[in-house]
């Protein structure tokens, strides 16, 4: 979920589920099991995206593991600087860079805080680095106007729950 703060710092009171915004128009894109939609960001910027890309990058995942455990396997590979894990996170960063430019066009967002377990550790750093590269190289109209960033490591992991818990009561 994404909440909006206007240019004066006021909470706007409207919410949009960017997780379900399309980021892939390919008819064979991954289908979200909850919404039934294809190509949604939720399938690319979550552990689902990591799990899909891992075997293509040469990382074998035990099918008996839960999605969270599979993510941890890839994160461990990333901490060990394995090239396959870097490929996974670079790919996610590329998609994210293009998606951020798309979100900017639609919502005129300025600061984007990236949260969640996938953004944890070296992988999150590489995703951010790649997303910024894509924005600079391929979407120069966003240069100096759109600022994706990462919080501290603990906040990254708890992600949306921390953000939601810190909202003031209205």
Task: List where the protein language model places each region.
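Acidic, glycine-rich loop-and-beta core segments that form the ion-binding/anion-interacting portion
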Residues: 11-23
């Amino acid at each position: 979920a994404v909440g909006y703060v206007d240019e004066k710092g006021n909470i706007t009171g409207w919410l949009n589920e960017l997780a379900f915004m399309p980021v892939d128009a390919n008819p064979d894109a991954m289908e979200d099991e909850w919404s039934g939609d294809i190509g949604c960001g939720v399938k690319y910027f979550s552990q689902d995206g990591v799990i899909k890309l891992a075997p293509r990058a040469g990382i074998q995942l035990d099918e008996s593991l839960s999605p969270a455990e599979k993510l941890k396997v890839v994160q461990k590979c990333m901490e060990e600087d394995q090239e396959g894990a870097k490929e996974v996170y670079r790919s996610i960063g590329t998609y994210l860079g293009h998606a951020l430019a798309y979100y900017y066009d639609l919502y005129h967002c300025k600061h984007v805080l990236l949260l969640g377990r996938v953004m944890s550790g070296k992988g999150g750093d590489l995703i951010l680095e790649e997303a910024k590269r894509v924005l600079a190289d391929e979407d120069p109209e966003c240069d100096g106007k759109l600022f994706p960033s990462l919080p501290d490591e603990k906040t990254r992991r708890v992600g949306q729950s921390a953000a939601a818990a810190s909202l003031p009561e209205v």
